[in-house]
């Protein structure tokens, strides 16, 4: 839902933190943008940001690290054609704004007639997908350490083979304001938290690691004991399962991917290839293929920044556009790309609410929010039992992808060998090797158990990291290459 009152509340918070302490008002911002528009540029914007972040980690019952930081600044951008000029400063002042404006406007030739009047300000209505609370103050320091202590106790009580526990808690309060040369004014207040646990289990001299956690755009009090216990259970189970794991077999085979976090393969191998900048430049395997079949029937992929409280969700993107629910692939047919303002303009389409940047010191680019595949009609049990011989990858670690070719490599953190429809034993060291666009065409069964990840994803692109979400149902993909150690 897009509503006006919370939008105005967020603007008030942004003014209080980003303008008033520095003696600035919106007249000063309009003058800065007019300075840029005195030259011929297609777009210009100011991006103000205030970020407060805190982190705690506990190991062996001892607080190992505690961190706290405050960062603030402004990024000033001008765009002419496909060229971008950008300057940023941690000094928020009239002088630094004007200096930055005079620097970036040189990307365009001086306009005839001198200064240009910036259009009347219009407040961009935005969504209200999460509260504007400061999560750092949602628990006091003692309560934060006690939460981590309970997580450690839960893990040790779970199984005597658990010999080491590491727990971490991170929280961030991020306030942004975007002012554009077209008169648009937008703001967002973005809480973000994450609880993580890693355990090491030992049996007969063999050690294995298991990790789990979750988070989103809410307060730290979201992590009640039941939720913390679920993270602990998952981490311990992963470590204990891998204590009995055998070397993974190698070769070409059918693979079943579990629901939720395994959607990271979809995000990396397909999602990046659907970002507008790669497609405008023709460097993606999906370039120029809108309206064509790019996946098996039944495969529908969305990028949705409008899911309440999710890690990848945004009320407005970092260019001031409301987030959207974008259908990228529908029943196997390519429908569209993920767009920021510049690439949308150059491709003759509308922005999709995906202009994102790591901070005020970075330029925006098309980035994913929450990317997932919709569910089908098969039960997960039915999909696993369909395997004559193959791999069941329940969870993943890291992975890499080449955007141009679509080739990917992913390592499974928890996987099982299946024969005649029955899980035989856990395996370790399995890597999935394939081509993203090709793998999409090899999806043969789609589960009815679509699940989003627990809220732990961070995506890197061109040196910038942003929080994201991924998700999918249980899937069977035929003809994947598994690199193993057997």
Residue ranges and their predicted role:
Residues 1-486:
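N-terminal small-residue-enriched
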């Amino acid at each position: 839902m897009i509503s006006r009152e919370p939008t105005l509340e967020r603007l008030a918070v942004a003014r209080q933190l980003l303008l008033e302490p520095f003696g600035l008002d919106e007249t000063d911002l309009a003058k800065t943008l007019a300075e840029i528009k005195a030259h011929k540029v297609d777009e210009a914007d100011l991006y103000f940001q205030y970020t407060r972040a805190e982190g705690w980690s506990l190991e062996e019952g001892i607080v190992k690290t505690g961190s706290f930081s405050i960062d603030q600044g402004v990024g000033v951008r001008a765009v002419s054609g496909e060229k971008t000029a950008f300057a940023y400063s941690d000094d928020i002042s009239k002088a630094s704004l004007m200096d930055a404006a005079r620097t970036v406007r040189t990307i365009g030739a001086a306009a005839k007639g001198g200064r240009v009047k910036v259009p009347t300000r219009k407040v961009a209505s935005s969504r209200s997908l999460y509260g504007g609370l400061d999560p750092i103050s949602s628990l006091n320091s003692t309560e934060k350490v006690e939460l981590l202590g309970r997580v450690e106790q839960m893990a040790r009580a779970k199984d005597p083979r658990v010999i080491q526990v590491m727990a971490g808690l991170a929280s961030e309060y991020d306030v942004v304001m975007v002012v554009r040369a077209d008169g648009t004014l937008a703001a967002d207040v973005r809480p973000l938290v994450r609880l993580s646990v890693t355990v090491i289990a030992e049996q007969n001299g063999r050690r294995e690691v298991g990790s789990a956690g979750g988070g989103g755009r809410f307060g730290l009090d979201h992590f009640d004991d039941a939720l913390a216990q679920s993270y602990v259970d998952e981490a311990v189970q992963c470590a204990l399962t891998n204590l009995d794991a055998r070397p993974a077999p190698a070769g070409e085979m059918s693979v079943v991917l579990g629901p939720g976090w395994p959607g990271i393969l979809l995000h990396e191998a397909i999602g990046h290839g659907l970002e507008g900048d790669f497609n405008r430049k023709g460097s993606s395997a999906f370039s120029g293929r809108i309206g064509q079949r790019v996946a098996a029937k039944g495969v529908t992929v969305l990028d949705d920044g409008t899911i309440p409280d999710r890690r990848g969700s945004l009320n407005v993107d970092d260019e001031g556009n409301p987030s959207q629910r974008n259908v990228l692939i529908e029943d196997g047919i390519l429908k569209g790309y993920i767009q920021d303002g510049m690439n949308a303009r150059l491709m003759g389409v509308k922005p999709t609410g995906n202009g994102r940047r790591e901070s005020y010191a970075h330029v925006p680019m098309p980035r994913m929010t929450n990317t997932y595949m919709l569910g089908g009609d098969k039960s997960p049990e039915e999909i696993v039992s369909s395997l004559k011989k193959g791999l069941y990858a329940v969870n993943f670690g890291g992975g890499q992808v080449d955007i141009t070719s679509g080739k990917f490599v992913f390592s499974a953190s928890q996987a099982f060998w299946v024969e005649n429809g029955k899980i035989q034993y856990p395996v370790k060291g399995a890597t999935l090797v394939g081509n993203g666009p090709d793998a999409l065409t090899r999806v043969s069964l789609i589960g009815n158990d679509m699940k989003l990840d627990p809220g732990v994803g961070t995506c890197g692109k061109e040196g910038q990291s942003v929080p994201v979400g991924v998700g999918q149902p249980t899937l069977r993909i035929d003809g994947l290459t598994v690199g193993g150690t057997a």
